Amino acid sequence: PIIDQGPLPTLTDGDKKAINKIWPKIYKEYEQYSLNILLRFLKCFPQAQASFPKFSTKKSNLEQDPEVKHQAVVIFNKVNEIINSMDNQEEIIKSLKDLSQKHKTVFKVDSIWFKELSSIFVSTIDGGAEFEKLFSIICILLRSAY
């Protein structure tokens, strides 16, 4: 399971190898995956849409909303950036702590959504325990400013 508090899990070399083996196949189809993940998240947690004021108010047309597509790609690309930085933990920590501060003060996002979105992300890409560890790291760091 994905955790969002406590000490940061450690990605082993085996975890990193498994992620690096699977991720390029997923990232190659990032537009499809990213939109599916965000739409599934908003369907499961409609109240989370309040965190995205630029999205159209018509929930039935979210898949057509260019802002939804843009945000989906932004999220997916951030995950890609983290995966590409797995060997530089300091860089990941700084990047996600800065993003945490921004989500708290600028975007005013409830920190509960990080874990919920991460769970949907991992299940959508059919990720294993190594992805749960990776997203636990992401969630813990995204909650750091809260």
From Swiss-Prot:
SUPFAM superfamilies: Globin-like (SSF46458). PROSITE patterns: GLOBIN (PS01033). Heme b binds at residues 71, 103. The keyword Iron applies. One of its GO terms (molecular function) is oxygen binding. The keyword Transport applies. It comes from the Eukaryota. Keywords: Heme, Iron, Metal-binding, Oxygen transport, Transport. InterPro entries: Globin, Globin-like_sf, Globin/Proto, Globin_lamprey/hagfish, Mb-like_M. Residues 10-146 form the Globin domain. Monomer. Belongs to the globin family. This is Globin-F1. It comes from Eptatretus burgeri.
